Amino acid sequence: MADPSTLTHPDPEGGVRMMDASQKSDSARTAVAAGRVHLGEEAFRRVREHDIEKGDVLTTAQIAGIMGAKQTDKLIPLCHDATINGVEVDFTFNEDEQAIDVRAFTKSFGVTGVEMEALTAVSVASLTIYDMCKSVTKDIRIGDVHLRAKTGGQSGNWKSKSEDTSPAES
């Protein structure tokens, strides 16, 4: 277990608090997150062919992902309200898996990182794909939501060992 004196969120009595970021310097920050929505054969085909009753699945999911990133501090306890300067959400059809790969890129100039915003964008976009396709099948799996890379801040740049793409290249 971590030494309680080194943790940033517990208060002296062991309760929780939001970390004070007021002494940190503004810096450029980016984050890339990814995930996958396994749809199965019919739903995958119908999304590709724009044949879902609710409408354009990927455009709706893209908007939802961007909206999710902007609401992260309202959804995640103790998450700072980051100044988001840009959010991109995009999709790739994964034929082998009959899945849609979801990627989000977030950008900010501020005192806190935007990793949680990128992860939230992927999660909300994925949930939206589920919602729009559930009339075709309920056997939809959302998975592998993870941070691929981040830049900036006190901890510097980081890239997942399982990824070969940096935020600038994503």
Swiss-Prot record:
Belongs to the MoaC family. It comes from the Bacteria. Substrate binds at residues 78-80, 116-117. Its EC number is 4.6.1.17. Catalyzes the conversion of (8S)-3',8-cyclo-7,8-dihydroguanosine 5'-triphosphate to cyclic pyranopterin monophosphate (cPMP). Residues 1-25 are annotated as: Disordered. It catalyses: (8S)-3',8-cyclo-7,8-dihydroguanosine 5'-triphosphate = cyclic pyranopterin phosphate + diphosphate. CDD domains: MoaC_PE (cd01420). It comes from Salinibacter ruber (strain DSM 13855 / M31). The lineage of its organism: Bacteria, Pseudomonadati, Rhodothermota, Rhodothermia, Rhodothermales. InterPro entries: MoaC (IPR023045), MoaC_bact/euk (IPR047594), MoaC_sf (IPR036522), MoCo_biosynth_MoaA/MoaC (IPR050105), Mopterin_CF_biosynth-C_dom (IPR002820). This is Cyclic pyranopterin monophosphate synthase.
